[in-house]
From Swiss-Prot:
A UniProt-annotated Pfam family: GKRP_SIS_N
Domain SIS: residue ranges: 55-218
Additional information: A lyase-type mechanism (elimination/hydration) is suggested for the cleavage of the lactyl ether bond of MurNAc 6-phosphate, with the formation of an alpha,beta-unsaturated aldehyde intermediate with (E)-stereochemistry, followed by the syn addition of water to give product.
Single GO MF descriptor: carbon-oxygen lyase activity
Record protein name field: N-acetylmuramic acid 6-phosphate etherase
Cysteines engaged in disulfide bonds, as pairs: none
Family to which the UniProt record says this protein belongs: Belongs to the GCKR-like family. MurNAc-6-P etherase subfamily.
Length: 298
């Protein structure tokens, strides 16, 4: 696909004279364009749901969720991956973000990194990619060689693959087994795909990881019951989670958390089933960590 023919490289009539308007009008133009992004994502919800189901199946079987991207797309993958351990208590290696050019590229532009097919393949080799893993290639344009080569390599290994781009029929979309293509149109600043396209990608990644964690029992109701208390804010959040899930008071919630070494799931089952920490943990283990199953089946 030629660059000049891509939707993400098109000229946006709504912002054609944005350099001549007031600062407030400038903000309104950008905001009006941003409002279209959730609608574009809404149109591909069935594709996102299909990807979540596949990711969950693979991760449940011992696989990992691997994000692969360059520039903004790569940084968004790293952002999503890095938030999973503290939010959901998973091991850091379960959700992995890879960016063309390596760690240096997180904060700096690395010339030519996105054009390196070898880079995409080697980065996947270096993390020991296996057929159990799911590789999600992220590229607004859908033409990034680093991502395309990585997806091709992953498919050769037998991995399930997902391609996220904002141009229909792109190489990323056709290379991956599952395509998620929120078409957000031309950017306010022509070609600046960190804007609407980046926002769409972030929304999709939010759904992929959150959907995976919900289906993995990491959420009870709408509470993040595997949150790790790494700071005072999260310490308080744990107490509030136990309170909201059980109806107990703050003192009871804190006492239960202390008794089970600050594991929200165990504390919730302790309070709701009137159990000690050891028995609550045992029952959770018997039901794969799903609070709902412990409550419904016992």
């Amino acid at each position: 696909m030629q660059l000049e023919k891509m939707i993400t490289e098109g000229s946006n009539a709504a912002s054609a004279e944005i350099d001549r308007v007031s600062t407030l009008e400038m903000c309104r133009i950008i905001n009006d364009e941003d409002k279209t992004v959730p609608l574009a994502v809404e149109r591909v919800l069935p594709d996102i749901a299909a990807a979540i189901d596949v990711i969950h199946a693979q991760v449940s079987g011992g696989g990992r969720l691997i994000y692969l991207g360059a520039g903004t797309s790569g940084r968004l993958g790293i952002l999503d991956a890095s938030e999973c351990p503290p939010t959901y208590g998973v091991k850091p290696g379960l959700v992995v973000g890879l960016i063309a050019g390596g760690e240096y590229a997180i904060q700096h532009a690395v010339e030519g990194a996105e054009d390196s097919r070898e880079g995409g393949i080697n980065d996947l080799k270096n993390i020991g990619l296996t057929a159990q893993d799911v590789v999600v290639g992220i590229a607004a344009s859908g033409r990034t060689p680093y991502v395309i080569a990585g997806l091709e390599y992953a498919r050769q290994l037998g991995c399930r693959t997902v391609g996220i781009s904002c141009n229909p029929g792109s190489a990323v979309s056709t290379t991956a087994e599952f395509a998620i293509t929120p078409v957000v149109g031309a950017e306010v600043v022509t070609g600046s795909s960190r804007m609407k396209a980046g926002t769409a990608q972030k929304l999709v990644l939010n759904m992929l990881s959150t959907g995976l964690m919900i289906k993995s029992g990491k959420v009870f109701g709408n509470l993040m019951v595997d949150v790790v208390a790494t700071n005072e804010k999260l310490h308080v959040r744990q107490v509030n989670i136990v309170k909201n899930a059980t109806g107990c008071n703050a003192e009871q919630a804190e006492a239960a958390l202390i008794a089970c070494e600050r594991n929200c799931k165990t504390a919730i089952v302790m309070v709701l089933k009137n159990l000690d920490a050891a028995e609550a943990k045992k029952r959770l283990d018997q039901h794969g960590g799903f609070i709902r199953q412990v409550l419904d089946k016992e």
